[in-house]
UniProtKB/Swiss-Prot annotation:
The lineage of its organism: Bacteria, Pseudomonadati, Thermodesulfobacteriota, Syntrophobacteria, Syntrophobacterales. Homodimer. Probably interacts with PlsY. Its EC number is 2.3.1.274. Pathway: Lipid metabolism; phospholipid metabolism. Disulfide bonds: none annotated. Its main location: cytoplasm. GO terms for cellular component: cytoplasm. Belongs to the PlsX family. SUPFAM superfamilies: Isocitrate/Isopropylmalate dehydrogenase-like. Catalyzes the reversible formation of acyl-phosphate (acyl-PO(4)) from acyl-[acyl-carrier-protein] (acyl-ACP). This enzyme utilizes acyl-ACP as fatty acyl donor, but not acyl-CoA. This is Phosphate acyltransferase. GO terms for biological process: fatty acid biosynthetic process; phospholipid biosynthetic process.
């Protein structure tokens, strides 16, 4: 197995990417290729004292974090991200990990590697720890806006992914909204509600943010803007809780080396983004993991380990197979057509009363 790491992508590249790749290496049964400026990467590896465990692939260009993704891909065909995705598309590597420009990661994966047939676009999936287990969030940031069909297709991806990852035969899917009623939310959310209610998925209806962690759903669907805001709020809250508990212990003079310390460490490991590592880009035909832009070495190492695990279990390959065999996308298209016809009938009937 070979994993390509976009070593020039991210706020702390390339240092954090190289350090993370070196950390992941001993626990990942894969050859790791780091893609980027050869002179700079080789210098970092020499300085680390380990210049042989990673293979350097030269890339003369870098896509910046603030660049428009699709345009940057067209202009920078020899960027580290572009080369990594090209290697994946050509079967030279088995997975790609990048902490770079998320718009560029999504665009490169979509156009160079390709989508599952019938799918309009991919979605980032992030498992959020809750007291009752994990809650899968889609979309966590691949696309800021979404139509009803995009939201419904994300629900199909969540359904199929949870079948593989969690062994759930009928995972409960909720639609993130500001209220439980069908008429709540914007047009896209209202239409997605109507569409999902017609499908054979285990759709539980709208779910409000205050009910997200009550164990009522296994996955929650939203557009990438809302999902990314929710994810970062969640990350910020968990970090604040850790700091609050530490400051409380210091203020009270308590010793956190015993049981309380183990509880705090368990909380940090369960809820801190570094230990999640990255988000699989569901809907892409091959394994792509997008790491947080601010990732440092620990997060990068965990993102690489996640990519390694997903590839070993053939999750992306199996996901594509289940999506096609399940027939959910075909059903979705059919129900979307029927919904459009019904809505036109209602509109026509109203206009001719």
């Amino acid at each position: 197995m070979k994993i390509a790491v976009d070593a020039m992508g991210g706020d702390h590249a390339p240092e954090a990417l190289i350090e993370g790749a070196l950390l992941a290496g001993p626990q990942c049964s894969a050859d790791i290729l780091v893609i980027g400026n050869e002179a700079r990467l080789s210098s970092l590896l020499a300085h680390s004292g380990d210049s042989t465990s990673l293979k350097v692939v030269h890339a003369p260009q870098v896509i910046g974090m603030g660049e428009a993704g699709p345009m940057a891909l067209r202009r920078k065909r020899e960027a580290s991200l572009t080369i990594a995705m090209r290697l994946l598309a050509e079967n030279e590597v088995d997975a790609v990990v990048s902490a770079g420009n998320s718009s560029a990661v999504v665009s490169a994966a979509r156009h160079l590697v390709g989508l599952i047939p019938g799918l309009r676009r991919p979605a980032m999936a992030v498992p959020l720890p809750t007291p009752s287990g994990k809650l899968l969030l889609l979309d966590a940031g691949a696309h800021a806006e979404a139509t009803a069909i995009h939201l419904a297709q994300s629900a199909v991806l969540a359904h199929c992914y949870l079948k593989i990852e969690e062994g759930l035969n009928r995972p409960r899917i909720g639609l993130l909204n500001i209220g439980h009623e069908p008429a709540k939310g914007n047009r896209a959310v209202q239409r997605a509600f109507a569409l999902l209610r017609r499908c054979s998925l285990e759709f539980t209806g709208n779910v409000e943010p205050n009910d997200l962690f009550a164990g009522k759903v296994d996955a929650v669907i939203c557009d990438g803007f809302v999902g990314n805001v929710l994810l970062k709020m969640y990350e910020g809250f968990s970090e604040t809780v850790c700091r609050f508990l530490e400051s409380l212990a210091n203020h009270d003079g308590r010793d956190f080396s015993g049981g309380a310390g183990r509880i705090l460490e368990r909380f940090r490991r369960d809820y801190h983004y570094e230990f999640v590592g990255g988000a699989p880009l569901l809907g892409i035909r091959k394994t792509v993991v997008a790491a947080h832009g601010r990732s440092r070495a620990t997060a990068i190492a965990n993102a690489i380990r996640l990519a390694c695990r997903l590839q070993e279990a053939r999750v992306f390959e199996r996901l594509a197979g289940i999506v096609e065999e399940d027939g959910a996308l075909t059903e979705l298209r059919h129900q979307n057509t029927l919904l459009m016809i019904d809505q036109l009938k209602d509109k026509w009937g109203f206009a001719h009363r």
